[in-house]
Amino acid sequence: MTSVKGLGASLGVAIGSSFVYKNEIDFDKEAILTHVEASKQLIEKFSSQILDFRSKERNDEADILDAYILILQDPEIVAQLNQNLDFSVEEVYSIFTSTASVFESMEDVYFKQRAEDILSVGKHLVFNMQNIEREITLNENTILIAEDLTPADTSSMDLSKVNGIVLKDCLLYTSDAADDVVG
């Protein structure tokens, strides 16, 4: 049995089978769709997930996906993407990393935190370009292990099956948010 030590975000002990969620871009995998097609599909997907979240009273996550759509429609990002319809996945993602670095350099904590949202949108756009399905099927009583999680990551998961979350980087869940997800 493996034992893990860290900072607790929420009181209690969770027992269950582990699921390691990997959210890394494989830049060697070719794009199937252009970034324009992938962006349209991603907006449709996020819009559908927003309606689903609202019906399940997961309004905070729905609001974040609303913001993700605004990022995809941001005039500066769209202008950079429209410079070349044949951008590679690296070139598309670099637009999001350079935009995120601008936000990370800002003094305001709110804007610094938006850098993670921008990177998340960039990753999901690349996944869409590569036609990588991000649907995750979890077993009952799962302990979810990840480097980090964003609302776009958890949007396709049945969180009622999650007993606990172990994160390397606590970007998404504070104690209250973790309690909401895990119950």
Regions found by a protein language model. Name each.
Residues M1-S175, G183:
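Non-catalytic, soluble scaffold/interaction modules
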